[in-house]
Amino acid sequence: MEASHALPHCRKPIKEPETLVRDPSCRLRQLAENTSEPLWTTGLRAMTDSVDLLSPYNSPEDIAAKTTAIRQAVLRESDNLKQPNFECVSTEDLARLFGLYDRTFFKGLLAQAVKAKTGQPLAFRLSSTMTRSGGKTILYRRRMPSRKVQANYEIAVASRMLFMTFKQVDRPVVVCGLTCKDRLEALHRIMEHEIIHLVELVIYGKSSCSARRFKELAANVFGHAGTTHALVTPGEHAAQYGIRVGSTVCFEFEGRRLIGRVNRVNRRATVLVEDAKGPRYSDGKNYHKFYMPLKRLSPASV
């Protein structure tokens, strides 16, 4: 069983970001104290008291200074992230980035709280199959043979969408309501978003980026003005090749030239080619299904 929380893709045209409340007062803590859901442990309550986690406020100047220092440390220390539009990233890079944020914004106590609650360190994963969410924070719960429930947390980042962005698409890239000028900035914003999910999961056991508490935490801690991303999706990437869902395309397969219709676009395009021997679909026709790399497809007119 698992609960997951993601940085969703913005499906609407880019517009002025929603105005979120940046509140240096203790209203968030007051909201938390009035909720029916208590903090998980005394240790976690001590953590939030120490860092003032539920009523944080960083000025724009503080946020800029801290994130600039983190960016410089990443470029200096990482074996992969040596340039802003990096071409390679590893889970060690994600762990390093999280650690820098944890120490800079939470005095290193967020990772400690994760370990104290689950007995396991926070895990990281790069996903080449996530096609809508820029990142995802997951709480896994497994029942052990002893009947105890083992929980652990994981932050996943959509590496494929990161690498498709800042290449050929000439448009603003907005993540969490902030315009990003390069791939590293986008990775920063994704990590910040997932950190807020992690904070809420650790303290409350649930998190929603559409909720008021999440939006105000993200605004106060990191200066976010939104909760979605506009990274390049596989569909937008495919459109650069003139390929969209419903497009008629041709391709070579085992020495034959086939013509079919694009039914879906993710990492590869799903192409349906009419064939009397194939299974029947809802339109009454028979098709064989092919999963094709975009570069092997070309538009066809029939």
Give the location of each predicted region.
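Metalloprotease/metallohydrolase-associated module, dominated by Zn2+-dependent proteases
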Residues: 11-27, 32-65, 75-185, 202-302
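Membrane-proximal N-terminal segments immediately preceding the first transmembrane helix
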Residues: 69-71
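Active-site recognition of the HExxH zinc-binding catalytic motif
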Residues: 189-202
